[in-house]
Design a protein with these regions (language model features):
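Viral structural modules
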Residues: 2-3
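Active-site-adjacent loops and short helices of periplasmic peptidoglycan-processing enzymes
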Residues: 35-199, 204-209
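Domain-terminus/edge residues, biased toward the C-terminal soluble/receptor-binding domains
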Residues: 170-171, 185-295
């Protein structure tokens, strides 16, 4: 009896994380033709109810209420994490700045690669509006604008991101960029692990004094704003498809770079508990880039 109950529990947990992966493949969160990984394909079988294959190279399912890891695959392997980085950028901005502050666009920010808001040097925006741009549309120029506003430079902001990671007890996470573009510095490459990415998300949605604001931003379907000069209006659509496709989904962030592949971190409420899933290296496009691409989503 007890063994059957444990088996059902294991199958449920793996089924939950596989549900995320299936939605990624089928419902357009990532392109269907690319959701496979070339190595480390692990067959997971628990009794008669075999959930199938989990193709993400690294994956974690966490009970966010307790911090307990319910399922793990290569959870401590360091990998680049693409735009899932932006959950750290967002929570630091919420904790360290007034949402009504004015943020100016530098030449460096305006020159960032797609995906971008499309700003020009000298424009000014309300910080709160930029957080929606950051989290809904994953704009790379917005991330740099916030980093420069909060810390004076991208490099200094990366130092502050790493300091926050250390405060959270994360020893395998290193930030180089605020937007998740592939990069490296004296501390090594831009990287995390599936477990530590899940722990960052747990902090954002469960522990941060600004968790309510974080959930509000990441939970809306769309948002519209203008620059402070009212010269242009911008519309943002939330690309976290799980908000409408999976019951109980409350927050999440997608990502992709040439080195990271497709990545995702998200939170959902199920049976009065909060769960977090982190997926790294879910796959790459079948038609690989002929040269390194800076694109991040």
């Amino acid at each position: 009896m007890h063994e059957k109950r444990r088996e059902r529990g294991r199958t449920y947990r793996v089924g939950l994380i596989l549900g995320f992966c299936l939605l990624i493949a089928v419902n357009g969160l990532f392109p269907v033709s690319c959701v496979y990984a070339e190595e480390e394909q692990t067959k997971i079988a628990y009794g008669e109810n075999t959930p199938g294959q989990l193709y993400a190279r690294s994956a974690v399912l966490m009970d966010a209420d307790s911090g307990r890891i319910l399922f793990a695959k290569n959870a401590e392997t360091e990998r680049p994490m693409a735009s899932t980085t932006k959950i750290m950028t967002c929570i630091l901005a919420l904790e360290r700045a007034d949402p009504d502050e004015s943020v100016s666009v530098s030449a460096n920010a305006a020159a960032q690669p797609r995906v971008r808001l499309g700003t020009v040097e000298g424009q000014k925006f309300k910080l709160k509006d930029l957080l929606y741009s950051l989290m809904l549309e994953s704009h790379n120029d917005t991330a740099v604008m916030l980093a420069e506003h909060l810390a004076g430079s991208v490099e200094q902001f990366a130092d502050e991101m790493n300091q926050k990671a250390r405060e959270l007890g994360l020893s395998h996470t290193h930030f180089v960029t605020p937007n998740g573009l592939d990069g490296a510095d004296d501390g090594g490459s831009h990287r995390t692990t599936a477990e530590e990415l899940a722990r960052i998300m747990r902090y954002c949605v469960m522990e941060s004094p600004k968790r309510k604001e974080f959930l509000e931003i990441t939970g809306v379907s769309s948002y519209q704003f203008s620059d402070l000069e009212q010269t242009q209006t911008y519309s943002c659509i939330n690309h976290n498809a799980f908000l409408t496709m999976m019951e109980g989904a409350i927050s999440g962030k997608t990502g992709f770079t040439g080195e990271a592949g497709y990545c995702y971190v998200g939170a959902l409420k199920r049976e009065k508990r909060t769960f977090i899933v982190a997926l790294l290296a879910c796959g790459w496009p079948c038609l690989l880039y002929t040269s390194p691409s800076p694109r991040d989503t």
